[in-house]
Amino acid sequence: MFDNLQRKFLNLIGIEIEEEDKPQESTKAKEENVKPKHETPKVVTIGKANQTEVTVYNLKLFDEVVKVCDALRENKIVVFNLEQVAEDHIQRIIDFVSGAVYVLDAKIHKVSKKIFVVVPRSIDLEVDEQLKEEFRTKGVFAWLK
């Protein structure tokens, strides 16, 4: 009959009101019928697991090196072939990719004389120790020492 504010006011001035015993079925029934509009899922997916993409590029011009770096930035494994690139551009391409590798904390590995693999930091790539030592001594990746 009285709402909460009126009841507090009457109690303040010293008048007490006794409540009538009413069945409280209606409030319980209302509570049971209330359903959340949208149930939240208990499991949240963070990302796609184990879906690593490998991209292969056969570069011909220096301007195409941007594709390699963009794919690396998208966390893709990149294999690129420099066999059709002019000799004076090969070192420029390797320098450009090496800069991207450094900035993105990735790794670069030489597969053959003009084929390279670049992997993002979230992926481990095993390289044979003998092959690794050969690359270090030849000076292609002297900064790996």
Curated annotation (Swiss-Prot):
PANTHER family: CELL DIVISION PROTEIN SEPF
Name of the featured protein: Cell division protein SepF
Function field: Cell division protein that is part of the divisome complex and is recruited early to the Z-ring. Probably stimulates Z-ring formation, perhaps through the cross-linking of FtsZ protofilaments. Its function overlaps with FtsA.
Pfam families cross-referenced by the UniProt entry: SepF
Principal subcellular localization: cytoplasm
Compositionally biased region (Basic and acidic residues): 23-41
Known partners and oligomeric status: Homodimer. Interacts with FtsZ.
This protein's UniProt keywords: Cell cycle, Cell division, Cytoplasm, Septation
InterPro entries: Cell_div_SepF (IPR023052), Cell_div_SepF/SepF-rel (IPR007561), SepF-like_sf (IPR038594)
Protein source organism: Caldicellulosiruptor saccharolyticus (strain ATCC 43494 / DSM 8903 / Tp8T 6331)
Gene3D superfamilies, per the entry: SepF-like protein
Family statement drawn from the similarity comment of this UniProt entry: Belongs to the SepF family.
Gene Ontology CC annotations of this record: cytoplasm
Any single biological process term in GO: division septum assembly
This protein's encoding gene: sepF
Compartments, record wording: Cytoplasm
